[in-house]
Amino acid sequence: PCACAEAMAAARATLVVGAKSSGLSAARLLRRLAERVFLTDDNGFPEQIPDGVEPVLPSDAAERLDDVQQIVVSPGIPAGHPLVHAALARGVRVRSELALAADHVHGRVIAVTGTNGKSTVTTLVADILAAAGRRAFAGGNLGTPLCDAVGGDYDDLVVEVSSFQLEWPHTLRPAIATVLNVSQDHLDRH
């Protein structure tokens, strides 16, 4: 059964769109899951690309949509991006890094969102939990992407979630969630 599962994973492929922190984190997780991973970014690639990840020039990325089952978009990639439109038109699943991570994390998820104060509250809650003797992860939009927490031994995952990360339907089902406040921000995107 193990060899069969590995063969099935190897047959799956994902195109990660965005080669910054969350995109690279998603690519690393997908490689750990033995998937084939393509990576593209309109702004170029970092010096270090995770092992086994295949860089794809933006001009060639749409051609890869025939080879993948899903694309994972970084928070900086707007829903109106041409590659996103092309994927949706072909029936390719579009998800966020947060959704990918949510399928694989273990532990109680606490989500923090809102216009202001997310980082402060995320850090504070994780510190309080750690002081109470719990193994707490603080991340998401704050510093460490949630995909990097997959496989970690955490009791609680306190996740800062930006409005950009909430654009895509996802499987994150927090045990606790809070919206700190809502005001007009990022109107160019929303």
Positions of the model-derived regions?
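Phosphate-binding loop of NTP-binding sites
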Residues: R31, E63-R64, P75-H190
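N-terminal leader/targeting and accessory segments in enzymes
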Residues: P1-S96, L100
